[in-house]
Amino acid sequence: MFGAITKTYYAEKMGLDPKNIVCVSVMPCTAKKFEIGRKDQNAAGVPDVDIAITTRELARLIKRTGLDFTGLPEENFDDPLGESTGAAVIFGATGGVMEAALRTAVETLTGEELAKVDFEDVRGTDGIKEATYNVAGMDVKVAVASGLRNAKELLDKVNAGETNYHFIEIMGCPGGCVNGGGQPQVSADVRNFTDVRAARAKVLYDNDAKKAIRKSHENPSIQKL
């Protein structure tokens, strides 16, 4: 999404030729290396993202150059497109995309500000989670599948007519992007005694709670679009 906006909206705003913009994405997912080469990922007639590196590869580059973040001066993120919300932060955890969407959907449908933005029913690393929310007099049924095995189980039930939902979130990696193939590897000594997926997800939710803006549609950069 960022790559597409960079090559279209940002290029137009800055008077740049999309061909002269190089977009590098740092991702927890190794599949992104394949996705950037897909023919449908070219909103401006050129690849939306030119280079995809994993978080583990970025860490190696940082160590290789000897970069010390503690010695760098504080700076604001670039503008435009430098602002983010709590909803964006939680995308990396299973259920995060669902929760971010619900925050916006509920306010859009009801026309009222949410008294509580946390949808905790869809959080957690369980294989399949279901929840029903009454929104503007309508029962909205949602489901979240963590990992492809659970996704198949959920979709088989839907295809068989056993259940139905208004919105389904599927995370290919169990626990979500925090458990992606490109993430820093954890030793067996740690994995055997610590739920790394849950620990990483907790950091995201903690960061979300500290954000001044926690809903996607309230991001000033998005509103300008």
Place the predicted regions along the sequence by residue.
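Iron-sulfur-associated redox domains of electron-transfer enzymes in respiratory
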Residues: 1-225
